C-alpha cells in the first residue's frame, strides 16, 4: 500500500529459523525469500523444521545464508525486515548506522525496510513477566539493565504443568534503543519517512493487533511497535 505495487523478494535479517521467510513464500507463488543469520546451528534447525515442512515448490523459493548481515551480498530486494529486536545487538550509534546504511544499499530503489522495537517505563526495569499458554507458562525476564548505557540482558524461561522448568532457554544481550533514536539513525542512513506503527486497543484497553502510523504514541507501561522506512 505504501508504494502502490506488489513486493515479491524479501530478505529476513537475523532470520534465525526463517519463520518470516517461510511465511512470505506461502503467501504467493511468485514470492521469494532470503534469510540471513550468523548462527549455522539455528539455520540448520530452520532448514529441517521450517523450510522442510513447506511444499517442495515453496522450499525452492527460500534461500538461507550464513553471514554477518553487514557483510552479506544479496540481489536488491523489495523488502528487508529485521524483527524480534535482534538488530539491537548493534549497541553503538556507529554500529547501528553502519547496519542501516548496509540495509539501505540492499534495497531496490523503491524498497522498504521494516523493524520492530519495544519500550514503555517497564522496559527500563529489572523484572519478570509471566504469560500462561496451553501446556506451558512463558516467562520474560529482564535480568539486568544499565541506565547509563541502556545495556540490557534478558532471558526467556518456560514452566510446565508438571512443575518442571526450562530456565534460560534463550538469552539476549543488547542495547535498549528508543523510537526517536531509531528514526533519526534511519534518516541519517539515507532512508525517507521512517514511520512508527502503533498498536490500537480493543474495548478492554488491550492491544488489538492492528497497527497504524503514529507520531506521538501513548505513555503505556509496555509497548511493541513497528518502524517502516522508505528508500
Model-derived regions, located:
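A short glycine-rich, Lys/Arg-flanked "PGG" loop and its adjoining helix->strand segment in the class I
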Residues: 96-109
